[in-house]
C-alpha cells in the first residue's frame, strides 16, 4: 500500500512525464511538489516506487518514468474528473458540434474526429448492427485437405460465416476441442450477450489447447465481424507524430493494431471495467499484449436505441489519461442528451 507521500510523488512523475516526455528527476519533483521534504527523501521514495514496479529508470544518471503498473495505479486511484475542466471542454465540444446539424451517427463521427485532434490519438469508430435477437445456432468443421479446414458459423437469421484454417498453424484436434467448447458455451446465446461468457471460455481454452489465444480471437472475430455495419478511423497521422513510434517496428505494430481492431477487442478490454461498473475501459501497455507495451487503448460503447457504436482511442502509453477520460465521459453525455 502506497503512502500519501509516495502517491504524490507518483502523481507528479506521471503528470510531468506526460507533458514533457522526459524522465523526471528529484530536483524537478521538489520544484513541483508543495511539500516540505528534502531531495534525499524524494530520491529514497522514488527508489522504493521503482523497486515496487511503479517507476522505471532508463539510465543511472537520469530521472524516472512511469511503468505500466504506475500508469495503472494513476488511472485507478489518482486521476479525477475536474469539474471546471469538464465544463470548459463541454462548452467547447458543444460549440464545435452544433448538435442541431447532425444525426447521432454523424455526431459520433465528428466528435471522434475532434477528440482525436485534441488528444493526438487515433480514433476508431465501429458501428454494430442491431444483433439483439440474433443467436449463434451451430458450428461445423469441414476438413478440406490434409492441411486445410473450414469452420462454419451458422446464425439464427440464416447467415453463415466461413473461416479457413491452415492446419500447420493450428492442430485439427485443437480445432475440434475449440468447436465443442464454443458450441457448449455459446450456441443459442444472443450475440450481444457473448461478452458475459468470454472469461470462462478463455479459461477453458487455455486449459485445453495450445493456440488458445489465436483460436479464441479468430472464432470471436468471425462471429462478430460479420455483423458490423461500418468502421471509420480518424487521426492515423498522429501515430507518425508521437515520438514513441519513431521506431519503425513499433509504428508497424501500432498501425496493425488499429487496422485489426474489432468488436472482440471491445469485449476484451472492457471485461474488467464492466465488472467494476465503469463506462470507460482503459488498457495500458502490456495489458494489451507484450508486443504493444508502448500503447494504450481507451474505449467506450455508446448505446443508441437497439444499436451500439464502439469508440476506441489508440495512442502511446504516455497520454493524458485525465483529459481522455473527461472527453470520453463528455461524448457519452452528449450522445445520451441528443438521443433523449
Curated annotation (Swiss-Prot):
<comment type="similarity">
    <text>Belongs to the HrcA family.</text>
</comment>
<keyword id="KW-0804">Transcription</keyword>
<dbReference type="InterPro" id="IPR002571">
    <property type="entry name" value="HrcA"/>
</dbReference>
<keyword id="KW-0346">Stress response</keyword>
<keyword id="KW-0805">Transcription regulation</keyword>
<dbReference type="InterPro" id="IPR036390">
    <property type="entry name" value="WH_DNA-bd_sf"/>
</dbReference>
<protein>
    <recommendedName>
        <fullName>Heat-inducible transcription repressor HrcA</fullName>
    </recommendedName>
</protein>
<dbReference type="InterPro" id="IPR023120">
    <property type="entry name" value="WHTH_transcript_rep_HrcA_IDD"/>
</dbReference>
<dbReference type="InterPro" id="IPR029016">
    <property type="entry name" value="GAF-like_dom_sf"/>
</dbReference>
<keyword id="KW-0678">Repressor</keyword>
<dbReference type="GO" id="GO:0003677">
    <property type="term" value="F:DNA binding"/>
</dbReference>
<dbReference type="GO" id="GO:0045892">
    <property type="term" value="P:negative regulation of DNA-templated transcription"/>
</dbReference>
<dbReference type="Pfam" id="PF01628">
    <property type="entry name" value="HrcA"/>
</dbReference>
<comment type="function">
    <text>Negative regulator of class I heat shock genes (grpE-dnaK-dnaJ and groELS operons). Prevents heat-shock induction of these operons.</text>
</comment>
<dbReference type="InterPro" id="IPR021153">
    <property type="entry name" value="HrcA_C"/>
</dbReference>
<dbReference type="InterPro" id="IPR036388">
    <property type="entry name" value="WH-like_DNA-bd_sf"/>
</dbReference>
